[in-house]
């Protein structure tokens, strides 16, 4: 079937994948998401090593199906799901991708202050941060925030209550705990990021501002005064064999 390379998870950020590589992950859902982020569209076959312990929503195959899955993928006969990624790009040229979600806000349990620009409108805000979710991640952190908002409002339904499709050309941003004051507003706290409507954030924090993806707080970009970050759909997409 060709050559193979065994790779430890910690080596992912620096490994150079070839354009025709097929990547096999053996582990839990988090490994799948983390692997997709470091690829350029190469197909991923996700194996559940212990179906008795793990549900594996992102793990469609078991160990015994590996050879068949790889053979079909090589032959171009496998079904595949496309996954839209989020991209954060700063005005000094730094970039970070997200498979599930991005967080922009304070490093610790303090308030973030920034200027938010979206869809032709702008507003200075103070909040505990902004979550930007992909369809892939819309049943995770985003779902939790939405459930809390619905509970407070007394509403039982919302069109995004069950998330949205992995392949949709959109992201969804949510402002956490926005604080209204004489100088900060709360009118732009929820919206869709599309190709036509990116989200721009300009930091007004002297220190402790961060941008990180997929819950990995140790791998972050600084978001302090002078930093402007644009959140948009990434050109790169993930490909998960199903």
Task: Mark where each language-model region is.
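Conserved residues at the C-terminal ends of beta-strands
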Residues: 26, 47, 105
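Catalytic phosphate-donor-binding core of small-molecule kinases
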Residues: 1-11, 52-130, 139-242
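Short glycine-rich anion-binding loops that position phosphate/pyrophosphate groups of nucleotides
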Residues: 28-31, 50, 135-139
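Short, acidic/small-residue loops that bind anionic groups at enzyme active sites
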Residues: 35, 39-60
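N-terminal glycine-/serine-/threonine-rich phosphate-binding loop
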Residues: 1-42, 76, 121
């Amino acid at each position: 079937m060709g050559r193979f390379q065994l790779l430890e998870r910690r080596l992912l950020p620096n490994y150079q994948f070839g354009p025709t590589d097929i990547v096999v992950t053996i582990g839990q859902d988090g490994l799948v998401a983390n692997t997709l982020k470091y690829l350029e569209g190469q197909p991923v076959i996700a194996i559940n090593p212990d179906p008795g312990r793990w549900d594996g929503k992102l793990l469609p195959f078991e160990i015994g199906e590996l050879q068949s899955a790889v053979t079909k993928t090589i032959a171009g006969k496998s079904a595949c799901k496309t996954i839209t990624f989020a991209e954060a790009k700063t005005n000094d040229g730094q970039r970070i991708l997200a498979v599930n979600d991005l967080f922009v806000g304070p490093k610790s349990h303090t308030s973030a202050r920034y200027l938010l620009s979206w869809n032709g409108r702008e507003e200075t805000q103070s909040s505990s941060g902004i979550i930007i979710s992909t369809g892939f991640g819309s049943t995770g952190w985003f779902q939790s925030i939405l459930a809390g908002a619905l509970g407070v409002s007394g509403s039982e339904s919302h069109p995004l209550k069950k998330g949205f499709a992995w392949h949709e050309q959109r992201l969804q941003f949510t402002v956490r705990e926005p604080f209204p004051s004489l100088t900060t507003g709360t009118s732009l706290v929820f919206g869709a990021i599309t190709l036509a409507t990116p989200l721009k954030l300009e930091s007004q924090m002297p220190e402790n501002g961060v941008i990180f993806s997929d819950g990995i707080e140790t791998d972050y970009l600084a978001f302090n005064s002078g930093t402007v970050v644009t959140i948009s759909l990434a050109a790169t997409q993930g490909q998960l064999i199903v």
